[in-house]
Curated annotation (Swiss-Prot):
Belongs to the FrdD family. GO terms for biological process: fumarate metabolic process. The keyword Protein biosynthesis does not apply. Anchors the catalytic components of the fumarate reductase complex to the cell membrane, binds quinones. The keyword Transit peptide does not apply. InterPro entries: Fumarate_red_D (IPR003418), SQR/QFR_C/D (IPR034804). It is found in: Cell inner membrane. It comes from the Bacteria. The lineage of its organism: Bacteria, Pseudomonadati, Pseudomonadota, Gammaproteobacteria, Pasteurellales. This is Fumarate reductase subunit D. Part of an enzyme complex containing four subunits: a flavoprotein (FrdA), an iron-sulfur protein (FrdB), and two hydrophobic anchor proteins (FrdC and FrdD). Its main location: membrane.
Length: 114
């Protein structure tokens, strides 16, 4: 028999942020490592181009995506990793997802001020 008033879960939005973070990490981080870790130090890409791109709306959107979503993925992994290890922190969901939310807000304001 079905319950008349099922309990709502916060898992779908959290899994959305987790999967977006994992996907963005897998796609963007190798490119960022190549550009910022190899090409820029070797002088093959001028720093001015990166600064100009970072000040455009698309650049700000990229900065937001590569900073916010991977944080959600990491915190989700830590939260569930601790659960798998039988380490149960009180209100761990509030702790990890709250820190991710706070981080997202701080990054949003920092990028807007850029």
């Amino acid at each position: 028999m079905n319950k008349q008033d099922p309990k709502r879960s916060n898992e779908p939005p959290v899994w959305l942020m987790f999967s977006a973070g994992g996907t963005i990490s897998a796609i963007c981080f190798p490119v960022l490592i190549l550009i910022l870790g190899i090409l820029l130090p070797l002088g093959l890409i001028p720093m001015d181009n990166i600064i100009v791109f970072a000040h455009t709306w698309l650049g700000k959107l990229v900065i937001l995506a590569v900073t916010i979503f991977p944080m959600w993925a990491g915190m989700h992994r830590v939260h569930h990793g601790l659960h798998d290890l039988k380490i149960h922190l009180p209100a761990s969901g509030w702790l990890f997802y709250g820190l991710s939310t706070l981080y997202s807000i701080v990054v949003l304001f920092a990028v807007i001020a850029l």
